[in-house]
UniProtKB/Swiss-Prot annotation:
Family: Belongs to the calycin superfamily. Lipocalin family.
A Pfam match: Lipocalin
Tissue: Found in the carapace.
Compartments reported by the entry: Secreted, Extracellular space
Protein name: Crustacyanin-A1 subunit
Keywords tagged on the record: Chromophore, Disulfide bond, Pigment, Secreted, Transport
Residue pairs linked by disulfide bridges in the UniProt entry: 12-121, 51-173, 117-150
An annotated GO cellular component: cytoplasm
GO BP: lipid metabolic process; response to reactive oxygen species
UniProt xrefs under InterPro entries: Calycin, Invtbrt_color, Lipocalin_ApoD, Lipocln_cytosolic_FA-bd_dom
Length: 181
């Protein structure tokens, strides 16, 4: 058996999840609305390549997510998911898309109205882990000042920001069609 290339030696970054959880819980409903994926690190679970648009609807307990965009085969793709507090009481969210598995997710930093820096990591046996990072924006573009805030947040937990790949967004994207899918 071969180890997938996204499973790497080392441990998940040290994140003060308790502090973030305490700060964000009162504002959680402010995360609702549309988020565009500005950039991400290598993630085999992200099946949408371009024009990634995420709609988060908060029902008081969890977010229902509708993610749309252009898949790697060039076709429009919709994925449904949920984002909810960890069911075992750990201070982080769990993200769970159809045909996948629930994974921990931490909002490292956000102002709720412009940007969000997201980190997901799972530690495995024998000193291996998988981590995935995202930069989200409320619009198809993200001002450099907010990109820098996310870069600083990721550098603060020793995530190599050169791993990020910018997501194609903008005038070539069928956002109006995506809203109706």
């Amino acid at each position: 058996d071969k180890i997938p290339n996204f499973v790497v030696p080392g441990k998940c970054a040290s994140v003060d999840r308790n502090k973030l959880w305490a700060e964000q819980t009162p504002n959680r409903n402010s995360y609702a609305g549309v988020w565009y994926q500005f950039a991400l690190t290598n993630n085999p679970y992200q099946l949408i390549e371009k024009c990634v648009r995420n709609e988060y609807s908060f029902d008081g307990k969890q977010f229902v997510i509708k993610s749309t965009g252009i898949a790697y085969d060039g076709n429009l793709l919709k994925r449904n998911g949920k984002l909810y507090p960890n069911p075992f009481g750990e201070p982080h969210l769990s993200i769970d898309y159809e045909n996948s598995f629930a994974a921990p997710l931490v909002i490292l930093e956000t102002d709720y109205s412009n940007y969000a820096c997201l980190y997901s990591c799972i530690d495995y046996n024998f000193g291996y882990h998988s981590d995935f990072s995202f930069i989200f924006s409320r619009s198809a573009n993200l001002a450099d000042q907010y990109v820098k805030k996310c870069e600083a947040a990721f550098k603060n937990i020793n995530v190599d920001t050169t791993r990020f790949v910018k997501t194609v967004q903008g005038s070539s994207c069928p956002y109006d069609t995506q809203k109706t899918v």
